[in-house]
Regions:
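Acidic catalytic/metal-coordinating carboxylates
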Residues: 36, 62-65
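Receiver (REC) domain active-site loop signature in two-component systems and cognate sites
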Residues: 58
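Two-component/phosphorelay signaling modules centered on CheY-like receiver
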Residues: 12-32
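Active-site residues of response regulator receiver
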Residues: 55
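Acidic, metal-coordinating helix/loop segments flanking the phosphotransfer/catalytic sites
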Residues: 33-51
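Short amphipathic alpha-helix used as the core "switch/output" element in two-component signaling
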Residues: 42, 64-76
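Alpha4 helix (beta4-alpha4-beta5 surface) of REC/receiver domains from two-component response regulators
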Residues: 65, 86-102, 113
Length: 127
C-alpha cells in the first residue's frame, strides 16, 4: 500500500512548494492536498494518512487544532506544523499536540530531516 501524505495549506503556492520538496525526496509517496482543516479532516475520515504536513495559519481552525484532531484519529502519525511564525510559544504548542515545527520557507533540508525522523519512528523502508 502506498505511503500517504496529507498536505494542508490555504495557499496553493505553499502547497505546491511542500509537494515539490516532498516529491524530490520521496517521489513514490502519494500526496493528498487540502485547503483547510475541515477538508483535511473529511479526507482523514475517508482513509488513513501516514504523515501530515500542515500550515499553522489557516482560516477557521489553525494547524495546531488540526494536528491535535489528526493525532486523535491516528495516534503516533508524524505531523509537521509549518509556519513563518517562529515564536517559542507556537513551537512549544506544536510539540504539545505531538507535531514537529518546521519553519517557512520550507527547505528541502528541513523536509529531509523531518522525514528521516519520521522514518525512524515508523520503521518506514528507505529511511
Amino acid at each position: 500500500m502506498a505511503f500517504r501524505v496529507l498536505i494542508v495549506d490555504d495557499s496553493k503556492l505553499a502547497r505546491m512548494a511542500v509537494a515539490k520538496a516532498l516529491t524530490a525526496l520521496r517521489p513514490d509517496w502519494t500526496r493528498v492536498e487540502a485547503t483547510n482543516a475541515d477538508e483535511a479532516l473529511a479526507l482523514a475520515h475517508q482513509g488513513p494518512f501516514d504523515m501530515a504536513l500542515l500550515d499553522f495559519n489557516m482560516p477557521g481552525r489553525d494547524g495546531l487544532a488540526l494536528a491535535a484532531e489528526l493525532q486523535e484519529l491516528s495516534p503516533g502519525m508524524p505531523v509537521a506544523l509549518i509556519s513563518a511564525n517562529l515564536q517559542v510559544e507556537i513551537v512549544n504548542r506544536a510539540q504539545d499536540v505531538g507535531a514537529e515545527f518546521l519553519p517557512k520557507p520550507l527547505t528541502q533540508e528541513a523536509m529531509s530531516a523531518f522525514i528521516t525522523r519520521a522514518d525512524q519512528r515508523l520503521g518506514t523502508p528507505g529511511g
